[in-house]
Regions:
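Short catalytic helix/loop segments, enriched in acidic residues and glycine
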Residues: 20-35
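Conserved N-terminal catalytic core of the sugar/cofactor nucleotidyltransferase
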Residues: 2-5, 13, 31-101
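Active-site glycine-centered loops adjacent to acidic/histidine catalytic or metal-binding residues
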Residues: 9
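Short acidic/histidine- and often glycine-rich active-site loop of Leloir-type glycosyltransferases
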Residues: 16-17
């Protein structure tokens, strides 16, 4: 089942934290609030997400795009070009995520 998460607010009440990143990306325990929300839904079998991002959406998109780079061991083989990058021991989540503007 798809779960829609509204993540486009400005975070005005926590402006000292949200000045540089959107509210869903403020970290708690080393992970963004958005990750904690998704983990909660995932616990109950909801693993397909549509994230409606607005304010600073590029930060949310970058976080998901770089997820494996942050959470896995990586070998960069510069002798054969960028396409020969190997991600070892991938830390996977059972999620399918779509980030919309």
């Amino acid at each position: 089942m798809k779960t829609v998460i509204l993540a486009g607010g400005f975070g005005i009440r926590i402006s000292e934290e949200s000045r540089f990143k959107p509210k869903p990306m403020i970290e708690i325990g080393g992970q963004p609030i958005l990750w904690h929300i998704m983990k909660g839904y995932s616990h109950f079998g909801f693993n397909e997400f549509i994230i409606c991002a607005g304010y600073k959406q590029e930060i949310i998109k970058s976080w998901f795009a770089d997820y494996f780079l942050r959470n896995s061991d990586i070998t960069f083989d510069f002798t054969k070009g960028y396409k020969n990058t190997i991600i070892h021991d991938q830390h996977c989540e059972p999620w399918k995520v779509r980030v919309c503007a």
